[in-house]
Regions:
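Nucleotide/phosphate-binding catalytic cleft detector across ATP-hydrolyzing
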Residues: 1-15, 21-208, 225-226, 236, ...
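A structural feature that tracks compact, well-ordered secondary-structure segments
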Residues: 218-219
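Glycine-rich phosphate-binding loops at beta-strand->alpha-helix junctions
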Residues: 17, 82, 163, 262-265, ...
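Conserved Rossmann-like nucleotide-cofactor binding loop
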Residues: 16, 214
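A cytosolic small-molecule/anion-sensing beta-strand core signal
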Residues: 222
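ATP-binding/phosphotransfer module of carbohydrate and carboxylate kinases, centering on a glycine-rich
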Residues: 306, 310-324, 334-351, 380-385
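Hydrophobic, well-ordered secondary-structure elements that form the walls
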Residues: 308, 327, 375
Length: 412
């Protein structure tokens, strides 16, 4: 590999699968997917580690597969984090500009963001991201970059995302036990937004729903900035469980039935279509209609969308969504999902998948890989100082790896 080539690795640690995406970037800035690894996820529930050793083994399988395909060793990753422990809040900071000539410098921007971060956070929680939404200079709002402007008073409106310390700590430990450095932790819907949303959608207003196995992650964008994030504690695994109970069949059989025959909107499925459900415990096989299967799936999918819509409606965000709703994640591939979402949200809905990359990009042009590809894109932008999200570490600290003892030092 040429010396001028940079390598970036995204690790999507999901409830049902783990994906490792490897990309390289040449001197011209073009990103090419060069390695992909997937493994069934074991040891996690709703994005939270419940069995460390099983999680480590799953990570190793996905990373080993990606390494073999890419032909290079993987030393560290940008990892996704999700789960119903995630919380978010909007905050504002205010400072007086420090220079005598009233010119705003980078140090002023850092100070005002630190002021905005000065909120009461429980000891068992940690800041994951601090995302500037806009700056206000002497009551002039809507400013994206105030450096070089003149003013006496500088304000910043930021979006702060926090997570449970133990949950973040266990994700990091699992990755490190797999022999890898953690260069960055990125909230999964924010990573996915890199891969599936365009600048126009972010400006116009859009809600992104990442329909995963254990959770559904919600992110609302307006005027180019993140305005709200939330986690709905239901996903594709709940649909599978509903099918298993309704058809009295094992989870693995229910998952296969969901993938092959599932539909989220019963009205779109003919009553005449049928499928075979394998008998268990010596019972004979039986035939059911696909419409009956869809009628088992639809209530859960509707519940997910209703809960997500409640989040979107908070603080009247729904009035800002000129770009409608974008669905991504593995569960979004189910037939009828877009149509059902349009009924619940009462606005245009589209499916989002990663686009515009080189190399093996055709292999990841699928909603299931949005988070993994988004993590790679985030890492590439952070490498040149273009990241959209801030955390507690400098670029140098990020490249050196995630220091658990330092990040969680407040607890000890």
């Amino acid at each position: 590999m040429a010396p001028s080539t940079r390598t970036f690795v995204g690790l999507d640690i999901g409830t049902t699968k783990i994906s490792c995406i490897v990309a390289d970037q040449n001197g011209g800035g073009e990103l090419r997917i060069v390695g992909i690894g997937n493994a069934p996820s074991e040891g996690l529930r709703r994005g939270v580690v419940v069995d460390l050793e099983k999680t480590v083994a799953s990570i190793q399988r996905a990373v080993d597969e990606a390494e073999r395909m890419a032909g290079i060793p993987i030393k560290g990753v940008s990892a996704g984090i999700a789960g119903d422990h995630i919380r978010s809040i909007n905050s504002r900071g205010v400072i007086a500009v420090s220079r005598k000539d009233n010119e705003i410098g980078p140090a002023d921007v850092e100070r005002v963001i630190e002021a905005a971060k000065a909120i009461a956070i429980p000891m068992d929680r940690e800041i994951i991201h601090v995302i500037p939404q806009e700056f206000i200079v002497d009551d002039q709002d809507g400013i994206k970059d105030p450096v070089g402007m003149s003013g006496v008073r500088l304000e910043a409106e930021v979006h702060i995302i926090t997570g449970a310390v133990t949950s973040a700590k266990n994700i990091c430990r699992a990755i490190q036990r797999a022999g890898l450095k953690v260069y960055d932790l990125v909230l999964e819907p924010l990573a996915s937004s890199h891969a599936v949303l365009g600048p126009d959608e972010r400006d116009l207003g859009v809600a992104l729903l990442d329909l995963g196995g254990g959770t559904t992650d919600v992110a609302v964008f307006f005027e180019g900035s993140i305005r709200h994030t939330a986690i709905v504690p239901f996903g594709g695994a709940n649909v599978t469980n509903d099918i298993a109970i309704g058809l009295r069949t094992p989870i693995d059989k229910a998952e296969a039935i969901k993938i092959q025959y599932g539909a989220a909107l019963a009205a779109l499925v003919s009553h005449t279509e049928s499928l075979t459900v394998n008998g268990v415990g010596g019972r004979s096989d039986r035939q059911i209609s696909r419409h009956l299967l869809a009628s088992m799936i639809e209530p859960r999918m509707e519940e997910i969308f209703v809960l997500a819509n409640k989040e979107v409606k908070k603080n009247h965000f729904v009035e800002m969504l000129g770009g409608g709703v974008v669905l991504t994640g593995g569960t979004s591939l189910m037939p009828g999902v877009v149509e059902l979402a349009e009924q619940v949200f009462e606005m245009p809905v589209r499916l989002g998948a990663p686009q515009g990359l080189g190399g093996l990009s055709a292999n990841v042009a699928d909603p299931r890989f949005s988070t993994g590809v988004g993590l790679v894109l985030h890492a590439a932008r952070a490498d040149v100082g273009e990241e959209l999200f801030r955390d507690r570490r400098s670029a140098g600290e990020r490249k050196a790896g995630f220091d658990l003892r330092r990040w969680f030092s407040d607890l000890f």
